[in-house]
């Protein structure tokens, strides 16, 4: 049972046998806490259960939770690889009680597991309790039989946990394993506690109080249990290892990296192998959970982790991308416990390979500058922070890589001057921005929201209603009236007009009263839930308090509804075809078309696009009902609803479902095939979409792809236009639509043949009469100081053929220089110069070709002494360019 996979299974099965529900690990991107960078503890997915906001169908749970600590307050990145127990990615084993059992049962379950199931000797175990937790102290004596000398009272935050400044909190009790006196260090609470002899393997949190704003801590009506045991630490103890990196999982990863680089796992580069093994896990699991490298947020943290590992791969002598080649080993070790690794393996490998390929250029440039700037420094010196900032700001070389590269030489970085340089740059950026009228105008909406309250939205039920003008805004200020011809904004007490949000554009239409007509050209949401109608008064005068008839443009709204529903179907179809890593990165839902951006880092093939389109249209043709329901946000997520990360959702959310639960790919407990949290407007049945036609696929950023599509009438018009173009083309080719591909292929082959023949004819024409070159009678061959120069201007010959002609000319001359200028239809010119071997000590083809390039308006040229090429935009000066070569030879 000592293998990591066996230990994980034993832990979960033990608690399952004791009435706990085995709950899968939640993603590394927290679903219910937008303030948290990454999931960093087992209790994160149960946070709302502990606070009473969420109810689950079980009161006891057990998990092995994926965790990352590499950003913000919990940042272990700099220590990884250099200590025995720091990791960016780790698994947290845990058991939880939500108002069921409490302190006595938690201690009993933990003690039996570590001593009976895991077989750890009791005399190697020590427990800590909070300084005034007499109950836990007595229970450890009673249940575990520990002597008082091995139950240590600890004051401070290490043994008292709280969720925040207020809320559930309680004392902790930790179990420590004693590695023995061969390892330096003392028990917890002693002056030597920072040594490695005593290792914490399990933390039991007894949530029994609620901290109030006044600082008091009354008892919770239902106390709960939250425990956490680091799997890697537990495995090290059970495998008789003092170092986490010596457990079977890491040994496999480190050995694979060592085999690929030739490094010794126990040699001087041991830390680099450990960094690669650890960071491979973090990178792979983050990518599998939908995070891709970028320059902000979670993507930036991922990029830092990846690039730190890639820096260490370079230190090991890797000349080609390395990390992607290790993914198979990771999948073999952890893929059974975490199937998402297997599903996302192609994406993980491709992302790592591409990122490492890109980073090598940055790394080489940055290291070169770093070596140059630090050459005079010795151990104990500080590297200039301003230079470190220049490396970061100008060359994209992260600060932590600068620190890491200098660390091996015992050189630090002046962080104070680095921070000063960073702040100076920010100040310059602020000073260079003078603000805008638009930004100033935006400031009005927050006080208006405070005064008027939220606008009631009626648009899910109707496109026409009545409303009362609550406020008028003109030129960024409240106005008493809006007159005919004036533009401004209107806030109503209620509206059927949808305000732009969630990628869906705002509605247009009219606001009407007797003698008054206001054309709405856009509707926006300001200050959260204030609907603002932008437009122009076409007739009459508007004033606050006026009652208006509100009419949304029906045809435009219908087209938007179809496009929004189609976006949901395409999102799910993309996930079905490309994998579970697909995550929305942005969208545009307009009446004319839709656009959907998503995490994926390689182009989608034509076959994949066709499959995505077919799957989405199958759901359209089923004409199933599109259902919307209001649900508690956590109930919706439990039912499989997908949320757009970054969106803030209230306690109650709108859930839009399409497609039957019996469709392939629908979750067993889902509300439908496509289930998303969405506040937009949608069709009533999928058939109302009409048709979905994907018309574009492209890259918009690193790791982000975009598809564009049409629906309904727009899709039909697009299809009809394409068919008509095909028919016209078939007519011109005198063939049928079915035979047109073969006809085009035949014509293309014929064209290639003719182009080859034309190229050969041009080359023969260009070199015509050269056989007489040795006699000096050939046109284009001149004598320059006793040296033969074959100088010719030709048309329509490509650069590769021009080089071939130059080689041919050199052979024909025997001894001499060949200069050929080829002009093209766009007026540009290419020039090639060849020098026979006997003359390269006198004339350099590179020097001669650069003289010609100057005349042609080009910028230099390059090649070898015997053959060089260049170009320029001014082909009309081909003759002058040849004369310049002759002059350079001494004519």
UniProtKB/Swiss-Prot annotation:
Its main location: cytoplasm. PROSITE patterns: AA_TRNA_LIGASE_II_ALA (PS50860). Zn(2+) binds at residues 564, 568, 678, 682. Binds 1 zinc ion per subunit. It catalyses: tRNA(Ala) + L-alanine + ATP = L-alanyl-tRNA(Ala) + AMP + diphosphate. One of its GO terms (biological process) is negative regulation of DNA-templated transcription. Its cofactor is Zn(2+). The keyword Protein biosynthesis applies. One of its GO terms (molecular function) is tRNA binding. InterPro entries: aa-tRNA-synth_II/BPL/LPL, Ala-tRNA-lgiase_IIc, Ala-tRNA-ligase_IIc_anticod-bd, Ala-tRNA-synth_IIc_core, Ala-tRNA-synth_IIc_N, Ala-tRNA_ligase, Ala_tRNA_ligase_euk/bac, DHHA1_dom. Pfam families: DHHA1 (PF02272), tRNA-synt_2c (PF01411), tRNA_SAD (PF07973). Keywords: Aminoacyl-tRNA synthetase, ATP-binding, Cytoplasm, Ligase, Metal-binding, Nucleotide-binding, Protein biosynthesis, RNA-binding, tRNA-binding, Zinc. CDD domains: AlaRS_core. Its EC number is 6.1.1.7. It is found in: Cytoplasm. One of its GO terms (cellular component) is cytosol. SUPFAM superfamilies: Class II aaRS and biotin synthetases, Putative anticodon-binding domain of alanyl-tRNA synthetase (AlaRS), ThrRS/AlaRS common domain, Translation proteins. Belongs to the class-II aminoacyl-tRNA synthetase family. Catalyzes the attachment of alanine to tRNA(Ala) in a two-step reaction: alanine is first activated by ATP to form Ala-AMP and then transferred to the acceptor end of tRNA(Ala). Also edits incorrectly charged Ser-tRNA(Ala) and Gly-tRNA(Ala) via its editing domain. PANTHER family: ALANINE--TRNA LIGASE, CYTOPLASMIC, ALANYL-TRNA SYNTHETASE. Consists of three domains; the N-terminal catalytic domain, the editing domain and the C-terminal C-Ala domain. The editing domain removes incorrectly charged amino acids, while the C-Ala domain, along with tRNA(Ala), serves as a bridge to cooperatively bring together the editing and aminoacylation centers thus stimulating deacylation of misacylated tRNAs. This is Alanine--tRNA ligase.
